[in-house]
UniProtKB/Swiss-Prot annotation:
GO terms for biological process: negative regulation of DNA-templated transcription. Negatively regulates transcription of bacterial ribonucleotide reductase nrd genes and operons by binding to NrdR-boxes. It comes from Leifsonia xyli subsp. xyli (strain CTCB07). One of its GO terms (molecular function) is zinc ion binding. It comes from the Bacteria. Its cofactor is Zn(2+). Residues 46-136 form the ATP-cone domain. This is Transcriptional repressor NrdR. The lineage of its organism: Bacteria, Bacillati, Actinomycetota, Actinomycetes, Micrococcales. HAMAP family: NrdR.
Length: 157
């Protein structure tokens, strides 16, 4: 690590701490040449492979933007969306992969969004899973009833 002050090619780590979100490490360093101290932040890179084959860096903001559309008009705050995006990123990073398919991000969003707001979940799932008919919605609603409310599976919508 080059010293940003004197450009010496080496530095000594004085202190390392995990960031609040647990996704990066903050290191306090000291240059052995000039003695000045500086901080660095280290994160593991994560790339997304889109359906078209294009590879781009992972972006929490894109998750928030996509989910915000599904939450429009719902009692979901920006803070809720930020927490959801953080949980999704943690889930993805826990796989240890440096590249992930865009489809896998959507799969990681669905359970978190279902916990946050069921209506927003249905909206997001209808686009993400390409619902084609009312039966697709009925099936998703039925699944929500069974999983979250303990109702029998044969209840009509």
């Amino acid at each position: 690590m080059f010293c940003p002050f004197c450009r010496h090619p080496d530095s000594r780590v004085i202190d390392s701490r995990t960031s609040d979100d647990g996704l990066s490490i903050r290191r306090r360093r000291q240059c052995p040449e000039c003695g000045r101290r500086f901080s660095t932040t280290e994160t593991a890179s994560l790339s997304v492979i889109k359906r078209s084959g294009v590879v781009e860096p992972f972006s929490r903001e894109k998750i928030v933007l996509g989910v915000r559309k599904a939450c429009q008009g719902r009692p979901v705050t920006d803070s809720d969306l930020a927490v959801l995006a953080q949980k999704v990123e943690e889930t993805i990073r826990s796989t240890g992969a440096s590249q992930i398919e865009a489809n896998d991000i959507g799969l990681a969003i669905l359970p978190e969004l279902r916990e946050l707001d069921e209506v927003a979940y249905l909206r997001f799932a209808s686009v993400y899973q390409a619902f084609d008919s009312l039966e697709d919605f009925e099936s998703a609603i039925q699944q929500l009833r069974v999983e979250h409310r303990g109702e029998p599976a044969d209840v009509q919508v």
